[in-house]
UniProtKB/Swiss-Prot annotation:
Tissue: Expressed in leaves.
Database matches in PANTHER family: THIAMIN PYROPHOSPHOKINASE (PTHR13622), THIAMIN PYROPHOSPHOKINASE 1 (PTHR13622:SF8)
EC number(s) per entry: 3.6.1.-
InterPro entries documented for this protein: DUF4743, NUDIX_hydrolase-like_dom_sf, NUDIX_hydrolase_dom
An annotated Gene Ontology molecular function: hydrolase activity
Nudix hydrolase domain span: 196-337
Coiled coil start-end: none
Residues binding Mg(2+): 250, 254
Location of the protein in the cell: Plastid, Chloroplast
Domain of life per record: Eukaryota
Name this protein carries in UniProt: Nudix hydrolase 24, chloroplastic
Transit peptide, start-end: 1-30
Length: 365
């Protein structure tokens, strides 16, 4: 069977209407009459945002062409490189000191970054020998802590020390099931080495025994990873919302998936990573979901954060992950996990166990 993209791509409205259909690459399917035509996939113009200047969907297609061969050990090398990209700088752990709240470690702060916090000695307190950072003991209520730290982050944000303020609060807690001690601006979380949580949904379609993944291309207006490839649905877990509630919310906002359909998503585990980049220490746990979608499903972005979508054979997605840097880094981990669970990465491949282990390099607590 010839493989190709079943796609939704942006086309300027001056050239095509929002419902214009033009033929593109061919593939065969014996799917029901509700699915796309049997011998041709189509491009549907649904956006007007231009593609990223760094790469186009044509570049993605060119790098996906060669069929993925699980027995080829070089394939796992490419996957291992993507895992390593999410787990950089761990030899620099000694440059960080604990951030402690109520005698529990909630994060880690780089010694170099503490110079900015020392200017706010009515909010941040340092131990006698600088071994850890905590908050002023007078700040003993979550709301008071949230307001006080928000004041500091606003000042540091205005100075460009903490860029990309999102006005989205994340909980500060030592582990997932622990109560939150307070909340903090999402953009500041890596500067305090806080644990972060997110949901990632592998939205897939199955035809004639072959699986296809819906892939999104991030808007160029995104403050992080603009223009990169992403999951159909993915999003951080903010304060005051459960994982399931966030799943439903993100499904609707990012892909126009109804609650009825989102409720079919199956929780399949987690991946985790720890990454150090100068003053930032990212410690994230990603809740992974598989969602089998109807063959005639077409995603529609609702929040302006996605530029375009493509439906791509999983074997070709594997090649893009292995051979390129087109995907947002953390997405590669979730896709590699999907490849394990759906049999595209097999025990016969050298490095199989090492790759599997390293998908959970972070603290899954």
């Amino acid at each position: 069977m010839a493989s190709a993209f079943c796609s939704l791509c942006p086309t300027p409205t001056s050239l095509f209407s929002s419902h214009a259909l033009i033929p593109t690459l061919q593939w065969r399917s014996s799917s029901s009459s509700r699915s796309p035509p049997l011998h041709i996939s189509r491009v549907l113009s649904v956006e007007t945002v231009p593609l990223s200047p760094s790469f186009t969907w044509n570049d993605v297609f060119e790098n996906s062409r060669k069929e993925y061969v699980p027995q080829n050990s070089s394939d796992l090398t490419g996957f291992l490189e993507k895992v390593d990209r999410c787990n950089r700088g761990l030899e620099k752990l000694g440059e960080f000191i604990p951030f402690v709240i109520e005698e529990q470690i909630v994060g880690y702060i780089h010694k170099g970054f503490t110079k900015y916090l020392r200017d706010f000695n009515d909010i941040f307190t340092f131990s006698q020998y600088g071994g850890h950072v905590t908050l002023n003991m007078m700040l003993d209520k979550p709301e008071e802590r949230t307001r006080a730290v928000a004041h500091v982050i606003k000042i540091l944000g205005n100075k460009g020390i903490i860029p990309g303020i999102r006005n989205e609060l994340y909980p500060v807690k030592p582990s997932f099931n622990a109560p939150a001690f307070f909340s903090i601006e999402r953009a500041a979380a890596p500067y305090f080495g806080l644990k972060g949580y997110a949901i990632h949904v592998n939205g897939y379609v199955e035809r004639d025994g072959q699986k296809f993944l819906w892939i999104g291309k991030r808007s160029l207006a995104k403050s992080t990873y603009p223009g990169k490839l992403d999951h159909l649905v993915a999003g951080g877990l903010p304060h005051g919302i459960s994982v399931c509630e966030n799943l439903v919310k993100e499904c609707e906002e990012e892909a126009g998936i109804s609650k009825v359909l989102a409720d079919r998503a199956i929780a399949v585990g987690v991946v985790s990573y720890m990454d150090i980049d100068r003053y930032c220490f990212t410690r994230d746990v990603l809740f992974c979901y598989d969602l089998e979608l109807p063959q005639d499903f077409v995603p529609t972005n609702q929040d302006g954060e996605v530029d375009s979508f493509r439906l791509i054979p999983v074997a070709q997605v594997a090649n893009v992950v292995r051979k390129t840097s087109f995907f947002k880094d953390s997405c590669s981990l979730v896709i590699i996990d999907f490849l394990f669970r759906h049999g595209l990465i097999r025990p016969e491949s050298p490095g199989y166990l090492d790759l599997y282990r390293r998908l959970r390099n972070g603290d899954c607590s």
